[in-house]
Amino acid sequence: MENAEIQTMFSVLGPVTIKPMFGGKGIYYQGSIIAVEFAGDVLLKADHVSAPAFAAAGAAQWAYEGRTGKAVNMPYWSIPADAFDESDAMARWVRLAYDAALRAAKASRK
């Protein structure tokens, strides 16, 4: 996905910073990572508070196979399909990702 498309997707927050990351891109807002782009897909950050909403909307959690062959779940979820058709829906999911990033930053400072 082109950086301009990513900027548009996250415009509800304001300008985001996009950095290369592990063959994809890390998407940051005010210094906190809120999403990743990998293989053309943007995955939004979620946590124990917001993950149930992503799951209920049919989003998929990013997972990869670890060294032991067991799935390792990452704190990133696909964007629910309705968000691509409705800008208000996209704004809601983007805000949830930012809220999760803020909670993660707060927890790491403790």
Q: What function would you assign to each model-found segment?
A:
Residues 1-110:
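Charge-dense, helix-prone N-terminal extensions
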